[in-house]
Amino acid sequence: MPFPSPKNQVPLLGLVSLFGASFSALAQPAQPEASLTPAASPSATPIFFADQTLAHLKQLRQAALASDYAFKQVAHLANNIGPRLTGSVQAAKAVEYVADEVKALGCDVQLEKVMVPHWVRGVETAELTQFPGQAAGTTQKIVLCALGGSVSTPPEGINADTVCVRDFEELKALPREKVNGKIVLFNHSFDKKIAAQGHGGEAYGQAVVYRSDGPVAAAKLGAAACLIRSVGGADYRIPHTGQTNYKDGVPKIPAAAVTAEDADLIAYLAAQGETRMHLVLTPQTLPDVESANVIADIKGSEHPEQVVIVSGHLDSWDLGTGAIDDGAGVAVAMETAHLVRQLHLKPKRTIRVIAWMNEENGSRGSKQYAKDHASEFANHFAVNETDGGADHPIGLNLKAKPEVKEIFEPVAKILQEIGAGTLNLSEHIGADIEPMEKAGVPAFSPMQDSRFYFNYHHTPADTLDKIVPRELQENAAVVAVAAYAVANAEQSLPR
């Protein structure tokens, strides 16, 4: 999952902005008690949320905290279906499952077809075969995983010296002959200190560029392969996978992520002298396959053509079981529909649940949706994507006009009861809803405690046990309350 941009991150003890319905009137200078001419009446502050809507939001919050529906959904996706890499049989099964579940809620369900990539992991091994201080006849195993989309080595592998750099600047400073034919390691650390302060997204944003762009930079100087230090905070020698991006006109070289511990090992030895590696990666890129976004609507009672989207992505990486990334987001979106039906609420605008396909390695699902629905974006009232795990939410990220933050204050007060009343204006919310963000559609997502998320993100440890049921309920409450609030708003949100 691409995480929100660094400026989206706020400290865990973020402050809730203060807002009063009559702030414009309070800002007026005091007037004398008597005046020869009557003072003009201040214009009424627009009402966005009727009292009945606010009452329904409180009901939704409480119902979400009492519901186990979302947990049952993510449990089925993670445990019964398992890893859902785009193009896999598990991904296809997940599409069928989610469609059946939201159909059972009484939603109008469509499977919108999309052709998606089919990349599969193969053998992935590495060992240091020559290094300073080596005992005769020994090697050192390196723990790694291929990056998504990586090309393969020859079946017998590559034998090459390693070159370690911390960043792109160090690589560019090297003459081509120092890189040509070698295995380049980008040893750029994920900043655990700022992640521990609640800025996990910022730490991720600083490091992920080496995963996405490192192999191309190395290939331009003739490297035989590229390794990157895993982008995340995992200990215990666990690698983080993720997509890398090749470019036309630049040779495609094998690419993998090594664990933080192995990156340190290679760098330590390479600093002492020649360090040689045998690397075998045998992934394959197979022909594209047909898949689908799951679209499920609860039709609006007054403005059915106006749409409020709640969403998560259904595909996952293949190392873990895709519980936090992003089974949780799909389950939270499904829970919104479940709660609205359970409480017999009638949203004025259509609430649309979307389970996106192929966020992790291509975003084909969201691109196809944008292509098919671009003419309707003017009637897309607001959009959500939940793709940051399921840790405790402290509020809402909003990508919208600044005045929308003030409009949302009554919603924030209701969410403050569960410690989720912070409102934060963000530059970006989610990869799948980015086309709608760019079209000016107001967007929102839970602002979550991100201290631990990147310890498990894109690793074999992305499993169901990482989800705390109560915190998943809190995320469901945040999304359901925010979605229903805008679905029943008395006026359009400013764009």
Q: What is each of the regions a protein language model found here?
A:
Residues 47-88, 114, 238-243, 315, ...:
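N-terminal capping segment at the start of a domain
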Residues 54-56, 129-132, 143-176, 243-323, ...:
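Soluble metallo-hydrolase cores and metallopeptidase-like ectodomains found primarily
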Residues 65, 103, 133, 155, ...:
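Metal-dependent peptidase/peptidase-like ectodomains
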Residues 72, 338-364:
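Short helix-loop-beta-strand segments that form the rim/entrance of peptidase-like active sites
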Residues 338, 342, 349, 454-495:
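His/Asp/Glu-rich mid-to-C-terminal helical/loop segments that flank catalytic regions of hydrolases
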